[in-house]
Amino acid sequence: MSQTKTEEPMSHRQILEALSGLLLVLFVAMVSSTIVSTALPKIIGALNGTQSQYTWVVTATLLTATASTPIWGKLADLYNKKLLVQISIVVFVVGSILAGLAQNAGELIAARAFQGIGVGGLQALVQVVIAAMIPPRERGRYNGYLGGVMAVATVGGPLLGGVIVDTSWLGWRWCFFVGVPIAVIALFVLQKTLHIATLRRDNVKIDYLGASLIAAGVSVLLIWVSFVDGSFAWLSWQTFAMVGAGLVLLALAVWVEARTAEPVVPLDIVRQRTTALSIIASLSVGMAMFGGAVFLGQYFQIGRGYTPTEAGLLTIPMMAGVLGASIVVGRLITRSGNIKPYIVAGTVILVLGFAALATIDHQTSLVYVGAAMFLVGVGVGSSMQNLVLAVQNTVPLKDIGAASSTIAFFRSLGGTIGVSVLGAVLARRVTDNITHALAAAGVPAGSGGGASNLNLNALPPAVQHIVRAAYGDATGHIFLISAGIALVGVLAAALMRPTALRSTLDLAAPAEKVPVTTR
């Protein structure tokens, strides 16, 4: 049995006040995942870390955030959503402080893993709380702000990291400290402004076994994705062992979820057409969001020779596209009540943007690159958050948490896998390009002065040019692959059922049968 402690509907002003706190904490949570991308060389150097530890500083946060996302979502369906958001903020703040105080790479990795638990909670719960505050019909315009913040955080994180490490009086530790005061402010803002109904359910049972199996299965697969093609080959016993173990654990999780009263991921929701197709589309959008930020930054720094700060500034067209599309499309959805046309259009624009980026090399006009990045941004901004909205519109309020976190989970998973796979393709392509260019220049193999070294200043000028050209030319190839994968998102969006957004927080209750009495 369940009881709901009702609250008066929040006014537009009250929603904006609460939304300010939610967006603040979501911003710092997502920035924490991307800010280290340009700062890591200095961080690992200062802590005397290894290449393996370099990878794990990023992987640890991504791993715990992705694995914990569906668990946070299910908890939101069972317990006080406001309290869970506040707990996530506290976990994030503690993890950030510990990371900033780390004295060696091992301590930093452990702190980042703990921080990731808070990040996973905030990524899932912010969307759940918004769904509990605002009916789907009105949610579009507010989701526009949410999508814009997520995009700015993802693309702007590397820029902020570059500025911090390039500023002598700050230092790399502020990459972790910078979000702490903002998160604390958001905590107090939410305590004062967030007022949503509290669902109280009797005899609640958490599916700990299912949650553990999901976390373990996803963790094994993400660890494999992080190390494949670097520590071992794609076709190796390590690959078969890790992929096999991950799939077995996830298969067991499905078996458990199908038989428990309170599954972490309700399978009846996942089997719904809208949810299933949104999951597929979210995988492609996730790769666009994360892959674009990672590899475009590398393209500008290595392929074109710009500094970390300059590379961050050059990604502004993509940031502007995401932010503008998120806000404009959100308002159009609220006005029309239809969501499918905008998701389809967004995924098509995403394909066009990637197709344009597939033609770039180390000499391509920055105006052309900027225009292509803007298209990618518009595609992401038109589809990313609206896929969550489409799912939220088709499930009852009691399942909003699980449904929203499922989409967020697959978006993060798609981004993780996409970055790893595209990174492996890029590395192989760069190696081939460098080898052929050195041979064409008459430089014997093994005498290129360490051409694979990313510290280009340590290379002879002629070899520097070869390495830059190799990276610049290879980057277009991986975006061609991205365009092909984004086509899957177009197909998934096109197959979604057109559904008008409902104007109530919850689905209409089925009509109760009138008892018939006999005399």
Regions found by a protein language model. Name each.
Residues D166-A281, A288, V348, R468-D473, ...:
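Hydrophobic transmembrane-helix bundles of small-molecule transporters
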Residues T69-L209, L397:
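Helix-loop-helix hairpins in multi-pass membrane proteins, especially solute transporters
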Residues R13-P70, E107, L209, W234-A402, ...:
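Transmembrane core module of solute transporters
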Residues D166-F177, F227-T239, T307, R428-A483:
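A membrane-interface helix-boundary motif in multi-pass transporters
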